[in-house]
Structures are given as structure tokens and as C-alpha cells.
Amino acid sequence: MDIARVVGADTRNDGYCSGNGYMVTWALGHLVSLATPDTYGYTKTAAEDLPMLPDPFRLVSRQMRTDRGMVTDIAASKQLKVIESVFNRCDSIIVATDAGREGELIFRWIYDFLGCTKPFRRLWISSLTDEAIRKGLEELKDGSEYDSLYAAADSRAKADWLVGMNASRALAIVSGSSNNSIGRVQTPTLAMICSRYRENRSFVSTPYWQLHVTLNGGTSHRRFFHPATFDDRQKAEAAYRSLSPDSSATVTKVERRKTLQQPPLLYDL
């Protein structure tokens, strides 16, 4: 909605905004996806059908898994009709999906699925501030400059399909169960989780000792730990005794400054 406001498309319609010569619409994630094996006639899990190698791959409106199998996502189908109507009414297109591989793929698959041939240019921004949007609109690039990015995303998606669909069906044939699935990302991730679970299950805690010093200053109390640890109590006590009880430390410099600290990364599996 930030882009619509900046370009003056202030009138809100069902699935898009309009005004000032612009029509601004949006995608709800991947509205278009690669068709499932059933679409190509692979309705049964059979060894003689492997490997499944669609040529060409087909695009379909986003599907949802239900008790009845895969069905078309109604929300995705509705928004695709809105986008198709907007495409038909415009002279050219400004692509404002995320500035990255997946953002490029989202638009290109919609563009191809709808059979659109209108010329398009790329708005490449990483910030949605008014200034960034205006600057990006002044520096629009021809869509063809991002053909290689699209090719990379398209190839990745099709490779994932080939690996995931074929390997999952092969596993189903071998195991006799269709409840298992294999994927380029999900399978290694699951393996990492299982490995960590096994490590945690077999972990045996052991005691350790660590030296620390406590500093008291008025109402402030600070405790600092030495990074080294001892797995033997006698060694820790020997290290403690090696310190002079009368030793002291002097603060020679205090520096205060404001800094920006990035949020911590996600937990490491």
C-alpha cells in the first residue's frame, strides 16, 4: 500500500488500488506454482513411471492440500483474475515484487500463466520509505535485465520438483507408505533436527568449575567469569590459590558510547 500511496493510487478497489493513471495490485505469495504429477498423468505411485520428467513443466493456480486431495486455492484464483484484469487494462507494467530471486519468480510465473505480453520494467528497491520508492521509480530498469535472475529461480524451482516428487514416490514404493516426503531443503533440515535430538538424548552432564571475580561499587555489583573452565576441582582450587588475596585492580579508563546492535541470528540447529 505504500507504493500505491506514493504514486497517488488512492482509490481502493477489490484486489487493487487505482488513481493518478496507475493501477496497483498485489500477489499473495506464490499465486502460481508448478503442477503436481497428477496433471501429467502420473496418477499412481508406480516404479515404471520413475523418473517423472515433465517437458514442458506446466503452471497452475496455487493448490491446497485437503482431505480430498489437492484443490485450487480460492483466494489465489480470485486474485489472479484481478491481476489479469489489471494487466488487460494497462499499457505497461511496473514490477514491484521483492528485490530478489523469489520475488522475480513470483511475477514471471504470474505473467506467463496469464499469457501476458505487455512490456514491463522493474522497480528494484529494498526499502519502502517514500524516498526509496520515489528514487526507485526514477531508476526503473528494463525487465529483460533480470532474465538471468528469473532463470536461476525457475531452474531452482524445477530442480526442487524433480528431486522432491521423484524421491518421495521412490521412498513410498520402497517403504510401502505414502506419508513420507523428501525435499532438497526439508530432508537435510529434518536430518539436522534428528541429529541434534539424538545428541541431546545421549548427553551426559558433567560438573565443571570456573573462576570469577565479584566487584562491588556502591549499589552496583558485577560478577565477571574467566572464560576457562576446569573439569577437575583440585585444579580449579590450585588456580584460585595462585591468585594473591591482596591483589587489586584499578580502572584506568571508562568509555561510554551509544551503538546500534543487530538482533541475534536464528538459533543454530
Pin down the residues of each PLM region:
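Amphipathic alpha-helical segments of the small helical/lid subdomains adjacent to P-loop NTPase cores
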Residues: 152-183
